[in-house]
Amino acid sequence: MRLWGLLPFLVPFILLWSIQEPELAEGFFIRTCPRVRVKCEVEERNECTRHRQCPNKKRCCLFSCGKKCMDLRQDVCSLPQDPGPCLAYLPRWWYNQETDLCTEFIYGGCQGNPNNFPSEGICTVVCKKKQMSSWI
Protein backbone atom coordinates (compact mmCIF):
# COMPACT_ATOMS: atom_id res chain seq x y z
CA MET A 1 0.00 0.00 0.00
CA ARG A 2 2.77 2.49 0.88
CA LEU A 3 4.46 2.04 -2.49
CA TRP A 4 1.37 3.33 -4.31
CA GLY A 5 1.56 6.50 -2.21
CA LEU A 6 5.02 7.22 -3.63
CA LEU A 7 3.92 6.77 -7.25
CA PRO A 8 2.93 10.45 -7.84
CA PHE A 9 6.43 11.48 -6.73
CA LEU A 10 8.30 8.81 -8.68
CA VAL A 11 6.62 9.32 -12.07
CA PRO A 12 8.14 12.80 -12.75
CA PHE A 13 11.63 11.56 -11.87
CA ILE A 14 11.26 8.50 -14.09
CA LEU A 15 10.11 10.71 -16.97
CA LEU A 16 12.99 13.14 -16.46
CA TRP A 17 15.44 10.24 -16.33
CA SER A 18 14.30 9.11 -19.76
CA ILE A 19 14.59 12.54 -21.43
CA GLN A 20 17.21 12.36 -24.17
CA GLU A 21 17.85 16.10 -24.35
CA PRO A 22 19.23 17.39 -21.03
CA GLU A 23 18.19 20.96 -21.90
CA LEU A 24 14.55 19.92 -21.57
CA ALA A 25 15.05 19.01 -17.92
CA GLU A 26 16.97 22.18 -16.97
CA GLY A 27 13.98 23.98 -15.49
CA PHE A 28 13.36 21.21 -12.98
CA PHE A 29 16.68 21.43 -11.18
CA ILE A 30 18.20 24.33 -9.27
CA ARG A 31 21.80 24.84 -10.26
CA THR A 32 24.33 25.89 -7.67
CA CYS A 33 27.71 27.53 -7.96
CA PRO A 34 30.59 25.12 -8.60
CA ARG A 35 32.28 23.95 -5.41
CA VAL A 36 35.93 23.94 -6.31
CA ARG A 37 38.48 24.64 -3.60
CA VAL A 38 41.85 25.82 -4.83
CA LYS A 39 44.83 27.44 -3.14
CA CYS A 40 45.32 30.87 -4.65
CA GLU A 41 48.62 32.72 -4.64
CA VAL A 42 46.87 35.96 -5.60
CA GLU A 43 43.22 36.84 -5.06
CA GLU A 44 41.54 38.13 -8.21
CA ARG A 45 39.41 41.26 -8.42
CA ASN A 46 35.78 40.29 -7.85
CA GLU A 47 33.31 40.92 -10.69
CA CYS A 48 30.41 40.88 -8.25
CA THR A 49 29.45 40.58 -4.61
CA ARG A 50 25.74 39.73 -5.00
CA HIS A 51 23.62 37.82 -7.52
CA ARG A 52 21.66 40.95 -8.47
CA GLN A 53 24.85 42.56 -9.81
CA CYS A 54 25.04 39.88 -12.51
CA PRO A 55 23.18 40.25 -15.84
CA ASN A 56 20.97 37.72 -17.65
CA LYS A 57 20.12 35.40 -14.76
CA LYS A 58 23.78 34.75 -14.02
CA ARG A 59 24.81 34.06 -10.43
CA CYS A 60 27.65 35.57 -8.41
CA CYS A 61 29.89 32.60 -7.57
CA LEU A 62 33.25 32.19 -5.88
CA PHE A 63 35.18 30.50 -8.68
CA SER A 64 38.90 30.01 -9.16
CA CYS A 65 40.39 32.89 -7.13
CA GLY A 66 37.60 35.47 -7.15
CA LYS A 67 33.87 36.05 -7.49
CA LYS A 68 32.52 35.90 -11.03
CA CYS A 69 29.12 36.21 -12.70
CA MET A 70 28.45 32.73 -14.05
CA ASP A 71 25.77 31.14 -16.19
CA LEU A 72 25.17 27.95 -14.22
CA ARG A 73 23.78 26.20 -17.30
CA GLN A 74 27.18 26.41 -19.02
CA ASP A 75 30.08 24.04 -18.58
CA VAL A 76 32.96 26.40 -17.79
CA CYS A 77 35.54 23.99 -19.18
CA SER A 78 33.84 23.85 -22.59
CA LEU A 79 33.93 27.61 -23.14
CA PRO A 80 36.37 28.93 -25.78
CA GLN A 81 39.49 30.91 -24.98
CA ASP A 82 38.50 34.56 -24.56
CA PRO A 83 41.17 37.22 -23.87
CA GLY A 84 38.54 39.97 -23.46
CA PRO A 85 38.69 43.45 -25.02
CA CYS A 86 41.11 45.12 -22.58
CA LEU A 87 44.83 45.51 -23.24
CA ALA A 88 46.55 44.25 -20.09
CA TYR A 89 49.11 41.47 -20.49
CA LEU A 90 48.19 38.76 -18.00
CA PRO A 91 49.40 35.21 -18.64
CA ARG A 92 46.48 32.87 -17.84
CA TRP A 93 45.36 29.30 -18.52
CA TRP A 94 42.27 27.92 -20.23
CA TYR A 95 41.05 24.35 -20.69
CA ASN A 96 40.99 23.22 -24.33
CA GLN A 97 38.50 20.36 -24.72
CA GLU A 98 39.88 19.41 -28.13
CA THR A 99 43.38 18.74 -26.81
CA ASP A 100 42.27 17.78 -23.27
CA LEU A 101 44.96 20.13 -21.92
CA CYS A 102 45.20 23.40 -20.05
CA THR A 103 46.89 25.90 -22.36
CA GLU A 104 48.46 29.28 -21.62
CA PHE A 105 47.03 32.44 -23.20
CA ILE A 106 47.21 36.20 -22.64
CA TYR A 107 44.21 37.72 -20.87
CA GLY A 108 43.49 41.42 -21.39
CA GLY A 109 42.28 41.94 -17.82
CA CYS A 110 38.53 42.41 -18.26
CA GLN A 111 35.43 40.54 -19.40
CA GLY A 112 36.31 37.28 -21.15
CA ASN A 113 34.70 34.16 -19.68
CA PRO A 114 35.22 31.88 -16.64
CA ASN A 115 37.43 29.42 -18.58
CA ASN A 116 40.31 31.60 -17.39
CA PHE A 117 42.57 30.39 -14.59
CA PRO A 118 45.58 31.99 -12.87
CA SER A 119 47.65 28.79 -13.06
CA GLU A 120 47.89 25.54 -14.96
CA GLY A 121 47.38 23.68 -11.69
CA ILE A 122 44.06 25.35 -10.90
CA CYS A 123 42.87 24.83 -14.49
CA THR A 124 43.75 21.15 -14.27
CA VAL A 125 42.08 20.69 -10.88
CA VAL A 126 38.85 22.34 -12.04
CA CYS A 127 38.51 20.88 -15.53
CA LYS A 128 40.17 17.47 -15.29
CA LYS A 129 38.29 16.74 -12.05
CA LYS A 130 35.03 17.73 -13.73
CA GLN A 131 35.82 15.56 -16.75
CA MET A 132 36.69 12.54 -14.60
CA SER A 133 33.49 12.88 -12.53
CA SER A 134 31.39 12.89 -15.72
CA TRP A 135 32.76 9.43 -16.58
CA ILE A 136 31.51 7.93 -13.32
Curated annotation (Swiss-Prot):
Question: Could you tell me where this protein is found in the cell?
Answer: Secreted
> What's in the keyword line of the UniProt record?
Disulfide bond, Protease inhibitor, Secreted, Serine protease inhibitor, Signal
Q: Which residues form the WAP domain?
A: 28-73
Please name the InterPro entries in this protein's record: Elafin-like_sf, Kunitz_BPTI, Kunitz_BPTI_sf, Prtase_inh_Kunz-CS, Serpin_venom_toxin, WAP_dom
Q: What's a Pfam family this protein contains?
A: WAP
GO MF annotations in UniProt: serine-type endopeptidase inhibitor activity
Note the SMART domains from the entry: KU
Q: Does the keyword Ribosomal protein apply?
A: no
Record-annotated BPTI/Kunitz inhibitor domain positions: 77-127
Record has Disulfide bond as a keyword: yes
Disulfide bonds listed in the record:
C33-C61, C40-C65, C48-C60, C54-C69, C77-C127, C86-C110, C102-C123
Q: Name one GO cellular component term.
A: extracellular region
Leader sequence segment: 1-27
Q: What is this protein called?
A: WAP four-disulfide core domain protein 6A
